[in-house]
Structures are given as C-alpha cells and as structure tokens.
Regions:
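A conserved pocket-lining segment of Rossmann-fold NAD(P)-dependent short-chain dehydrogenase/reductase
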Residues: 93, 143-145, 172-185, 196-219, ...
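C-terminal substrate-binding subdomain of Rossmann-fold SDR/epimerase-dehydratase oxidoreductases
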Residues: 20, 200-313
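Hydrophobic alpha-helix immediately C-terminal to the catalytic Tyr-X-X-X-Lys motif of short-chain
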Residues: 158, 162, 166, 196, ...
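N-terminal Rossmann-like NAD(P)+-binding domain of SDR-like oxidoreductases, especially those catalyzing
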Residues: 1-182
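Conserved hydrophobic/aromatic "anchor" residues
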Residues: 15, 125, 132, 180-183, ...
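Conserved active-site region of classical short-chain dehydrogenase/reductase
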Residues: 106-114, 190, 222-225, 229
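A short, amphipathic alpha-helix embedded in the catalytic core of nucleotide-handling enzymes
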Residues: 112, 166, 195-200, 227-231
C-alpha cells in the first residue's frame, strides 16, 4: 500500500467507522467520511464519536444519504472505499422497520457499487456473521452455506450478493469482511455490552435473553480495524471472517464486568429474542494465512477499555 491514500469511509460517524477513520488519518491518509445520521440512536452520540476526527487535517465529513444522494462527487480522487454504513440491529429488523433495512443495507450498497464501477475503485464491504444464522459448523469457515435467521442478516447477505454481482459483471474490485460481534469504546448504546455496563454501574436491572449460556465470538474494535485495513491488499472477489476464533458466554461476560466495575449485576431473564442465534465462532484461518491477521486484544482487556471509556463519557 502506498504511503498516503485517499479513502472514502461510509458510516464514518458510527461505532466502527469512527475508529477506522481515526486509524487511517493517524497513518497519514486522507479520509472523506460519509454519514446520514439516522435516528437509530442520538445524533449527539455520533458527533461525540467524531470529536477527534473533526479536528484532524486529513478528515472531511459529508452528511448525505447513500440511498438517495449524489455519490460521484464523493469519489473524486478516492483510491479505496470502506463501506460500513448500514442499518444495524437484529431485533429491530422485523415488521414495519424492515423497509429501513432494505433502503440502508441493500439500496445504498447497490448505488455505491454503481458509482464505483466506472472508476474501478476498490471497495471493502463490512458484512456480518449474521449471514450464517445458526451454523452447525463451529468455528464457521467462509464456505459455510449462509442461512440468516433475521431480516437484518438477510439484508447483509443480499448486499454481499450485490458485491459479487458487480465484481463478476463489471470487475469492481470488492473484498467482503464478515465481522463477528464487535465491542469496545463507542459501542452503540443499543448493544449488549453498552447496556450491561450502564446497568451494572447504576445498580439497574440488565436484560438477558435466554439462559445466558449462548456463546459469541466477541471481537475488539481495534482488531476489527486492523483486519479491515489489511483487506486493502486482499485479492478482489474474496470474503473473510474477522473474529478471534474464541467464544465466551454472556454469563461469563457479565461475571467479568462485575469484577471490573466492582458491583453485582441484577439480571432479568427474558425469552430468547427472534433472530438471535445460539452460538457464533469465526474460523479465521483464511484471513490469518492470506493477510497476516492476528487478533491481539483479550476479552478481559477489551472490556476494561470499554468500561473505562463508557464511564468517563
């Protein structure tokens, strides 16, 4: 990779997008950050995510909607695009809300690919472990047949299909990354760890869906960013998992948070939510072999960093 490049980062004001944008700017690259500031969570949270970036010389923020705005001007002199913008959330993707997922996860991706195809700009697409559904293969390799069990997972898979279609038919150099449960500072307020930390620290009940023995491959945001940046040099048309290859139960996470915060959790058990899967685990053999990816942050250390950042906000 050249010493300096110009990147487009969609979803730049979000949890992962803001960390990725910072890492790129810190390496001396120029970043055009795009975000439409949906009402999924409060605008001030996203603006806080951008606090350091907005002071950086190499960062420019553009507020626009990928599903309807003019995209060609955003791509001027851009050499690589990271497409992280999406409507997140498994549990919120049912019913009337589904139209938002179609617009932001499918239509927006198709329009960006259209804009990229004439310029042959490389795109790294942020997909999700949700496309696998309740996989019986654990750890789950990339060649596992996708069977999403939520509308959210279905829209992320459809966006992957669009990426392949534009790669196959127009030669758009796309690389797909399937992120496994990301956590860390700036985690969205609707996500489990953010809710657990807020509840435990304030002595309030925290909701746990099911028995808490469901296991996830929890991946620290810094490791996600590292893997994403390595994908700049990946072969177009490839798809990689980004995780740790290790799993932890929700009950174990809660016990660790109790130790870090110094308070006992008040757990409220609820029925398993629609679209939730029992276990996830990333097989990271391919990305480790091809790109040299190595996750470096233990869950305990990552949780300590998230607790510190969240309680200091």
């Amino acid at each position: 990779m050249p010493d300096t490049l110009r990147f487009l980062v969609t979803g730049a004001a979000g949890f992962i997008g803001s960390h990725l944008s910072e890492a790129l700017v810190d390496q001396g690259h120029a970043v055009v950050g795009v975000d439409c500031f949906t009402d999924y969570y409060h605008r001030r949270t996203k603006l806080a995510n951008l606090a350091r970036l907005r002071k950086a010389k190499g960062f420019r923020l553009v507020e626009t909607d990928l599903s309807s705005g003019r995209l060609s001007p955003l791509l001027k002199d851009v050499e690589c695009a990271f497409h992280l913008a999406a409507q997140p959330g498994v549990r919120a993707s049912w019913g009337k809300s589904f139209s938002h997922y179609v617009k932001d996860n499918i239509t927006a991706t198709q329009r960006l690919l259209e804009a990229l195809k004439d310029n042959q700009i490389k795109m790294v697409y942020a997909s999700s472990s949700s496309i696998y559904g309740d996989s019986e293969r654990l750890p789950t390799p990339e060649d596992t047949p996708p069977r999403p069990v939520s509308p959210y997972g279905a829209t992320k898979l459809e966006a992957e299909h669009l990426c392949y279609i534009y790669f196959r038919n127009f030669g758009v150099p796309v690389v797909g990354l399937r992120y496994f449960t990301v956590y860390g500072p700036r985690q969205r307020p609707d996500m489990a760890f953010a809710k657990f930390i807020a509840g435990i620290s304030r002595g309030k009940e925290i909701d746990v869906f099911g028995d808490g023995e469901q296991r996830r491959d929890f991946t620290f945001v810094k490791d996600i960013v590292t893997g994403s940046m390595l994908a700049i040099n990946a072969k177009p048309g490839t798809v990689y998992n980004i995780g740790t290859g290790k799993t932890t139960s929700l009950n174990e996470v809660i016990t660790t948070l109790e130790s870090i915060i110094g308070k006992k959790a008040r757990v409220k058990r609820l029925e398993v939510a629609l679209g939730d899967v029992r276990n996830t685990s990333a097989d990271i053999t391919s990305i480790s072999r091809d790109l040299g990816y190595r996750p470096t942050t233990s869950l305990a250390e990552g949780l300590r960093r998230q607790v510190k950042a969240q309680l200091l906000e």
